[in-house]
Amino acid sequence: MSRFFLFFLQLLALIVLVFSCQEEFIPATVAGPHPLVVEGYIEAAGERSSPPYVFLTRSFPFFSQISGEEFDDFYVHDAEITVSDGEEEYLLTELCFNDLTPDQREIAANFLGRNLDSLGINLCVYLDLSLSLFGEEGKTYTLSVEAEGETLTAVTTIPEQVSLDSVYFVEPPGEPRDTLAQLRVILDDPPEDNWYRYFVRVGDDAFRRDNFSVFDDRLFADERLEFPLNRPLAPGESFDLSTFGLFRRGTDMSLKFLFIDEAHHRFWETIEFAASNQGPFSNYTRIATNIEGGLGIWGGIAASYYERRVPDL
C-alpha cells in the first residue's frame, strides 16, 4: 500500500472524526418562541404612490411540516397597526380576501401583484382604507404593531430616487435569436450609498421579481453604468438557457425600478441567498430584519415605472 494512499486514508478519517464531533446546530427559532412576522411597505411613486400595507403572520418552526389546515391559522387577526410620518399617526384596517367582491378581488390582486385565487388561502392584509397617507421621498415612517400581547416596531426611510437614463432592448448576446430581445438600462448612480431592486411585468401578468432582484452600488458608486435586467420566470415555466432572461418581441413590458434603504436591501438579499442556497449541503441562513420584537421587513420604496413594447430589432 503506497504512502500516499495511507496518508489519504488518515486524512479522510480525520475529517470524519472532526465532523462527527461537531455539535449539532439547531437554529434558535426551532427550540425557542416563534415570533410574529411583518411584511409591510409604503411607496413613493408620483401619481402611482401607494398607502402603507402590512401582512402580519405567524412564524413556523424551522423543521416543521406545514399542512393546509395550519395555513388557516397563518394570519394574525385583530391587531392594532399604526404608521406615523412624524406628524400624524394613521390606523390600518384589516381586510381579508374572502370578504371581497369579485371586482374588489381583481383590484386587490393588481395592487398587490399577486394572483390571490391561486393561493388557496384567505389572504389578509392591513391597509390605510382612508387613503390619507401616501409615501413621500425623503420621509421617515414608523410602524407600530400590537398583537397577541406583543409589541413590534420598525422604522424606514424612503430614499430620494434618480430616474433611469435609458430603458431599451437589444439583440441577445451569443447566437442569433430573431424572436427574442434583451432588456438593458443605463443608470447614473448618485455619489452616496444606494440600494436597488426591480420587478418586471409582461403583458397583463403581475409584476414579478427575478431570483436576484436586489443589488447595491459598492462596485460602481458615482458612475454611469449600463447593464441588463432579466425577465423573471413565470410560474410553471421551465428553465431554458437559450431563452433565460430574454423577452419575446412584440410583447408589452413594464419595469418597476426601486430605490430602497440598506435594511430593506439586506432583508431581500438574505431571502434570495437562502432561496438559491438549497440542497443537502446548504447552510442555514438567518434572514435579516428591521423589525424590533419580531421578524420580517418594514420597507420604504421610491419607485419609477417604465412601459415599453419589445421591438422587432
Regions found by a protein language model. Give the residues of each.
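Bacterial N-terminal signal peptides that target proteins for export
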Residues: 1-9
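Generic hydrophobic-segment detector
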Residues: 10-11, 30
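A sequence/structural signal for flexible, mid-protein segments enriched
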Residues: 22-313
